[in-house]
């Protein structure tokens, strides 16, 4: 699988920067910017994986969170923020980029991993996982985590090469 990435900007420190998302089979993360992803069935896994970690999100994603994200350091970014500066200030071993499409794109050159939970849905239109990317990169499969196996919902974990 190929995903765009800018190679000339390595991740600061040894920080793991994990893009995590619930996506449809045709690559959408939401129907529109105000949608609460009630269709996602991976919330318990998301909570477990992101607990006690920094989570990076755009302002639209932040607005869709009715109760915030207890137990996590929330970092809300805007269009003018520099990803390298934000990542340099994180004093943990890992952080998660949790959306939306512009934010995944903005941090794409810093991602070390992708955790994608594929849901058996097809949206006619909406917000793609990555809205704009600069270059292609390779990712390699690491593991498959059952979410709701009987419904065919699994989290695919990839390492960004």
Q: Which residue ranges define each predicted feature?
A:
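Enzymes that bind and transform nitrogen-containing heteroaromatic metabolites
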Residues: 1-161
